[in-house]
Amino acid sequence: MAYKHQIIERKWQHYWRANHTFETSDSQTKPKYYVMDMFPYPSGQGLHVGHPEGYTATDIMARLKRMQGFNVLHPMGWDAFGLPAEQYALKTGHNPKDFTAHNIKNFKRQIRSLGFSYDWSREINTTDESYYKWTQWIFEQLYKKGLAYEDKIMVNWAPDFMGGTVVANEEVIDGKTERGGYPVYRVPMRQWVLKITAYADRLIDDLDDLDWPDSIKEMQRNWIGRSEGASVFFPVDGQADTKIEVYTTRPDTLFGATYMVLAPEHAAVAKITTPEQADAVKAYQEAIESKSDLERTDLNKDKTGVFTGAYGINPLSGKKLPIWIGDYVLSSYGTGAIMAVPAHDERDHEFATKFNLPITQVIEGDADTDITEAAYTDDGKHINSDFMNGMDKQTAISAAIDWLTEHDAGHKQVNFRLRDWIFSRQRYWGEPIPVIHWENGETTLVPEDELPLKLPAAKQLEPSGTGESPLANLDDWVNVVDENGRKGKRETNTMPQWAGSSWYFLRYVDPTNDQAIADPEKLKYWMPVDLYIGGAEHAVLHLLYARFWHKFLYDLGVVPTKEPFQKLVNQGMILGTNHEKMSKSKGNVINPDEIVEKHGADTLRLYEMFMGPLEASKPWSTEGINGSRRWLDRVWRLLIDDNNRLRDRVTMINDGALDKIYNQTVKTVTEDLEAMRFNVAISQLMVFVNEAYKVDSLPMIYMEGFVKLISPIVPHIAEELWSLLGHDETIAYAKWPTYDAKQLVEDVVELVVQVNGKVRAHLKVAKDATKDAIEAAALADETVQVHTDGKTVRKVIVVPGKLVNIVAN
């Protein structure tokens, strides 16, 4: 008789809620284990089957650690601000707050139906005023330390889209908005910026101490992009007071620099452009106004540029270098100016070839190297480089930097690809930035004791049309007057969705504290997060921003650790049956509600963990889900009869038949669960069930141990079996089983039998067999006798536990 999953799962979910089974104590008498998921954005679509994969993995670890005696913190919350809710509100006229609350209710129902052991008493929501009070507080501390500042930033401005709004680089295609095809222009706009670059070195160096996938660490290192090189100053010919600074990682190639390229927005362009070239330069600048940074730096696009009419002076060679502007150089990267070495850089070579600029080789190539045809980008000895001739790369770099420093023409420089974090959004549905701009030009923070600065209700969410957020339309909220009659305006930009997720792991520790982010003693106990699981799509930005804020709070003395997440695991993607990514447009999205209703939550949990390694992407299989359900029925029938009672085979007597396989299973499953090899652990549990079906009696102690072993993976059926085994208390805190190492010792060993040095047979003998017994058994082996027939055995060499070598002729 199959187990009735609907009844059993509802029963135990109700039990857990009614008994507050998974509410975490802040008592510090036990070792702690803090395990969490990347909290979801509560979309209108609800959960898909990809969500439970990571959630099941963290739940298995949480349940395992509870049974091993740890005090486990396993929370859940909602990353609920963001553009989708605002777009939905604009489209439908619904309030994003109501829409978000409805979505959260649905998400929570779905998550609860899967039996995850979250401590819901610690639930957080980034849109709650009591939560974003502290998001605003962190911003204010950043501002006080000079790490939050205003700046004019080039943005993608679409004046005809949604009444006039800023769009992201990814939303611009061929100079038009992805949605609607409206023209986009690059314009400078006032933005709030966070100085993440102040932490760039620490963000790279501290990765070494983290138990993270190497691929994720490397992505972060590349994003931060630390490089060592030199800043070089190029005087402008005929303009004694003007020098152009260039950052290069290859100062050793300065003798090969034949021209310079500035970003069209570079501050020096207007000053150095000659009257003859002014019209061409202006036309070029206007032509590239609508291009996003992504389009401008696309390696596949044709290089474009215009000569300014000016020349820079190469500080090493004294030669004049024509100064061009080109859109592939960005003002936001480095100094916004490059020295071009076309003989040894493919992009520079392409530009030089197109505009017939000189190419000078300074690195010795192969015999067939022709720098007129292509750049030579490998290493080699330096040539045509004066005092650097004959030097290798590193020696020449050091020599070039020494020369530049000695002649005040440059200096050693560490540079970063990382740019400061543009922190403001021209949107309504986000945390208000707690700043007031006064009529006398002063900017002040909202006093801390007046936080949170609440997001006001708004009926109209259309953009202001000025580039400001819809909050600019709310005069009563925007306009303020201080006690002296001074007039001011509130900041109308809001924070990005990244803000709330940059510190939420701290709030779980003490979610109702209204005096601080969290109690310092609780933070000291719980931090860092021991295990953090989520998708690799957050490998860079979320994790980088969270690490930045955490390090800042560490410097303030608010948190006790330098890093927030000690171990990180990225679960793989669950694909459609045809190995394609699940999406609504492809019609291959699978709703977990349907699986839970038909097969049960335990079946879904078991299947997703058995599909393959956690980190791997794998296709959904209907047969696989059916197979997982069949195995659970098999587990049920092993212990429970058709009358829903414990089988008579379950006995207090142990005849020893399962000793070895049980102890092997406890050892293997424990090790595999701790290493998060969930599919391997499940395979061993299946082996145990197969063996258990072969024996006459099932010792109670082994059946209890087995039910404990399956409980982190399939908790509902485990709770029911635990109850039927005679226990009144939940299995959630039952002591994790241990194994008897003596039972794992093999009683029989296999020996290799050689005749005249060649392997002829394999022999199984008792582990404690004597040499005489082993010799007799080897000589009696039929295969050995074939190879000794008609020969005289001269000698038998026995190496206990390994081999027998028979010498015969």
Curated annotation (Swiss-Prot):
Task: State the span of motif ('KMSKS' region).
Answer: 581-585
This enzyme's EC code(s): 6.1.1.4
The protein's location, in the record's own words, is: Cytoplasm
Q: Which UniProt keywords apply?
A: Aminoacyl-tRNA synthetase, ATP-binding, Cytoplasm, Ligase, Nucleotide-binding, Protein biosynthesis
Positions bound to ATP? K584
Q: Which reaction does it catalyse?
A: tRNA(Leu) + L-leucine + ATP = L-leucyl-tRNA(Leu) + AMP + diphosphate
What the entry lists under InterPro entries is as follows: aa-tRNA-synth_I_CS, aa-tRNA-synth_Ia, Leu-tRNA-ligase, Leu_tRNA-synth_edit, M/V/L/I-tRNA-synth_anticd-bd, Methionyl/Leucyl_tRNA_Synth, Rossmann-like_a/b/a_fold, tRNAsynth_Ia_anticodon-bd
What is a GO molecular function of this protein?
Answer: aminoacyl-tRNA deacylase activity
Q: Which GO terms describe its cellular component?
A: cytosol
Is ATP-binding among the key words of this record?
A: yes
Q: Which GO terms describe its biological process?
A: leucyl-tRNA aminoacylation
* Sequence motif 'HIGH' region, residues: 40-51
Q: Name the NCBIfam families on file.
A: leuS_bact (TIGR00396)
Among HAMAP family, the record links this protein to:
Leu_tRNA_synth_B (MF_00049_B)
Provide the family line. Belongs to the class-I aminoacyl-tRNA synthetase family.
What name is this protein filed under?
A: Leucine--tRNA ligase
